[in-house]
Amino acid sequence: MKLYRFLTGPDDASFCHKVTAALNKGWHLYGSPTYSYDTETKIMKCGQAAVKDVEGKEYEPTTKLSDY
């Protein structure tokens, strides 16, 4: 199955660690990162899409992406 996630977080080290952890679990970056200002919290937010192929599994809507 092919999986897709969109990782988001504040523009700080925690977001970088989230992306790094995903890369180390076999996820691959997909497309360009995003960067925007959250007017409610008044902080910059980052986003990055990631994809992963998992052999021998079928996708179901109940699939928990963080398990992969």
Predicted regions mapped to residue ranges:
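Terminus-proximal functional modules
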Residues: 1-68
